[in-house]
């Protein structure tokens, strides 16, 4: 695939993924976890995605080039009590190395925003590693703004 980063890559399709896509999604999800310094474990990747899809706890968007899976986004729904609206958390975004720089991430992000709007959400939130400057540049180029009002905490259980 050869395409300028700002051009729409040819033959890229972004669609909703289902349980029948697990064999294509699981290797991408495993590679995503490895990127974030988790050990490769295809069985864990497949089981995690299967449970999310089976229980309808997330929405997965799959990008394909000429029928081959090359990226995904996973969205989780939640609600903003303050705004009294639905919100979506863009928790996972991954594009295979062979498809990077061709606009696949932009297409996935656009489809995620389209999904959020279609479900009446007031916003689409995401987080990324402090050192992931490439992703940060993408998000900022799409109009995402760094939250300077709230500080987020977590508790390991």
Q: Where is each model-derived feature located?
A:
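Conserved acetyl-CoA-binding loop-helix of GNAT-fold acetyltransferases
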Residues: 95, 101-114, 137, 141
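Conserved active-site alpha-helix within GNAT-family acetyltransferase domains
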Residues: 106, 130-149
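Conserved beta-strand in the GNAT
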Residues: 62, 68-77
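Active-site rim helix/loop that mediates acceptor-substrate recognition in acyltransferases
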Residues: 40-60
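Helix-loop element at the rim of GNAT/NAT acetyltransferase active sites that forms part
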Residues: 27-40
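A short beta-loop-alpha structural element at the N-terminal edge
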Residues: 13-27
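Conserved GNAT acetyl-CoA-binding A-motif
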Residues: 109, 116-127
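Conserved beta-strand-loop-alpha-helix junction that forms the acyl-donor binding cleft
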Residues: 100, 122-135, 154-157
């Amino acid at each position: 695939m050869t395409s300028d980063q700002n051009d729409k890559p040819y033959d890229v399709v972004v669609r909703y993924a289902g349980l029948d896509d697990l064999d294509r999604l699981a290797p991408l999800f495993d590679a995503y976890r490895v990127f974030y310094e988790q050990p490769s474990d295809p069985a864990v990747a497949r089981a995690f995605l299967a449970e999310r899809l089976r229980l309808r706890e997330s929405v997965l968007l799959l990008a394909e080039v000429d029928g081959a899976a090359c990226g995904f986004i996973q969205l989780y729904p939640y609600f903003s009590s303050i705004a009294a609206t639905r919100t979506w958390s863009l928790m996972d975004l991954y594009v295979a190395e062979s498809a990077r720089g061709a606009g696949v991430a932009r297409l996935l992000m656009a489809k995620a925003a389209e999904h959020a709007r279609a479900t009446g959400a007031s916003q689409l939130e995401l987080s990324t590693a402090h050192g992931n400057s490439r992703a940060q540049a993408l998000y900022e180029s799409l109009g995402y703004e760094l939250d300077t009002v709230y500080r987020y905490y977590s508790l390991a259980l």
